[in-house]
Amino acid sequence: ELYGLTRADIDFERHCIHVRRQLCRTAEKPYFVTPPKTKSGIRNVPMTDTVCAALRRVVKARASTKVEALVDGCSGFLFLDKSGMPKVAMHLENYMRGVQGKFEKAYGKPVPRITPHVLRHTFCTNVQQAGLDVKSLQYLMGHSNASVTLDVYTHSSFESVERAFEQIAGNL
């Protein structure tokens, strides 16, 4: 979803991101736009001040191109590669793999593989543990069913259960 964003999808006044599409690429088809996997994936996501500031920097730093890439009627993608073409998820995965390799080389220790999808799980878990209600979290994640949000994307540990239990223990 990140790389499918265009300037028109960012509403800085309302601190809101309009998620409408995914930008994809395969060996057979260089670039194409698809809607999110489910109808619930089309949504407006509130931005934190940190995200808003980061996207302002992206918009400001985005180089203007001589010719804007047009993919299935969409243009103005926020994230471009060195040749001015829109980035896709593979670009971020490769970048993250490179950072992981540099870390392992510098410190001589393997680290768990971190992907954009792992970060999505981490975000979902952290927001749930911070206390956001399930329906709001389901909406944020773009899931059509809360069971996907809870059963697949949120994860518990003994420490998180212990912290939550300590918060309610006085009410028992």
PLM feature spans:
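Short, basic (Lys/Arg/His-rich) helix/loop patches that form interaction surfaces
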Residues: V45, A61-P86, M90-Y139, H143-A146
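Structural detector for helix-capping/boundary residues
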Residues: L5-A8, T122, D151, S156
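Short functional hotspots where side chains directly engage DNA or cofactors
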Residues: R14-V19, T115, N126, Q138-S156, ...
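Acidic donor-binding helix in nucleotide-sugar-dependent glycosyltransferases
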Residues: E1-G4, S136
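Conserved tyrosine-mediated DNA breakage-rejoining catalytic core shared by Y-recombinases
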Residues: G4-A63, L70-C74
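Generic recognition of well-ordered alpha-helical segments
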Residues: D49, A53, R57-K60, N94, ...
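DNA/chromatin major-groove-contacting recognition/catalytic segments
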Residues: E28-V33, A130, D151, H155-L172
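Residue-level detector of conserved, well-ordered beta-strand and adjacent loop positions
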Residues: R20, T48, L80-K82, T154
